[in-house]
Amino acid sequence: MAAALVLVTGQGAAAVPLRVDQAAFRDIYRELVETDTSAPAGSCTLAAERMLARLKGAGFGASQAEVFVPEGRPKEGGLIARIDGSDPSAKAMLLVDHIDVVAARREDWPRDPFRLVEENGYFIGRGVIDDKALSAIWIDSLIRMKKEGFWPKRTIKVALTCGEESGEAVNGVDWLLQHRRDAVEAGFALNEGGYGITDANGKPVALYLAVGEKHSQSFTIEARNPGGHSSRPRPDNAIYDLADALTAIRRFSFPIRLNATNRGYFTRMAPIVGGDMGQAMAALGKGSTDGAVVAKVTSDVTYNAMLRTTCVATMVEAGHAINALPQRAKATIQCRLFPGEKVEGVEAQLRKAIGNPAIALSRDGGKGEAVAVPPPLDPAIVGPAEEVARKQFPGIPVVPNLLTAGTDGRYLSAVGIPTYGVPGIFLDPDGNGAHGVNERIRVKSVYEGRDYLYALIKRYAGR
């Protein structure tokens, strides 16, 4: 077999030659992207079965890899696999990722969203960044280890699951914890959420290691009124009462919370950001709560979200007829809770901020999701990430990052499995179109991230 394969782009121009192992990875990646796993049209089970076939072809037996399917959910299956370690006393490590994706309508895309296209240095397709690149890397890593005869000291487990993107689906990680705890029990887990950041020219700036994430909780606030004919306005009005409540929430800010993760983030990013903002970040990293410092840092919406619980109005519904006074008006408030914060406490603060007992406030239903528990900023996790980065990305710092969104890691952390979002794949400043049309990721970044993560897995696993 030739030492390298030449890949041809969708436009017919020759791309950078691939190593044989890279070509094998690309085929796994292609198969995942080209398997529609969106709800309700697609099937995570089919994707899991295809990955199982890959593992079987590499020599994994029935006791080492299998597909699981939650009862009554035939399309919401996933995959569990493992390579047993040589040291029974060493706690296992878990590589977890979701294989479901956000729906993509063919009419909105200039090309089939469920076809992997390589164009102008980018992979394009639904899920190329969220999150099938990482899923492909996990499967590819197991196959590479099998071929190399690599026998880790600690057991390596993999779980590819469904239900992260859709609230209607069974969450695969939650299901495994309830029904197959043995498959995911581990000393720690590596997950999505970490990434590399670049500047406007695509130059790498930092590697974000996600250490903690926020928990999502929605509330409904509602104002009611007897209503009446619109020709006879009354001083009390459900819409006005709701508007007052929304204004109160808008003006309210939850207190800032400092922990090891966000302090580490601001400390390491301060010299990179520079200027007045960098100075304020450095002060915050040292624990300062000076009003001017906090005001400067929180003027950036991302930094603000890393420092406190946030609540924002996302939907409004009011009135029933254009010629009638409204009998009810309601709004949805979406909150992102700082790690470790209790829903009850947030609810109480919202009630106090609204200050009107006539406004009803209720928690929206859901699947009883676990409150995010912050994992420790463990040197045994951070150290190897920095060590491998120095070899692969010299001069690029590893920065602990508090993820302001949420992942399936919240389920694992809640039951005592510290979960970290690993970096390696660099993103563009614009977010790469995740969840949108023409989702894309730099080809070079995917291959570099694959190499980084493979080395990192082996470093954590030991021999």
Residue ranges of each PLM-predicted region?
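Acidic/His- and Gly-rich active-site-bordering loop/insert found
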Residues: 16-128, 135, 139, 145-154, ...
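Metal-dependent amide/peptide-bond hydrolase catalytic core
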Residues: 54, 195-205, 209-448, 460-463
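Sec/Tat signal peptide C-region and signal peptidase I cleavage site
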Residues: 11-15
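Solvent-exposed, acidic/flexible segments
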Residues: 18-26, 37-48, 74, 128-131, ...
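Bacterial N-terminal signal peptides
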Residues: 1-10
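Acidic/histidine-rich catalytic neighborhood of metal-dependent amide-processing enzymes
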Residues: 122-123, 129-208
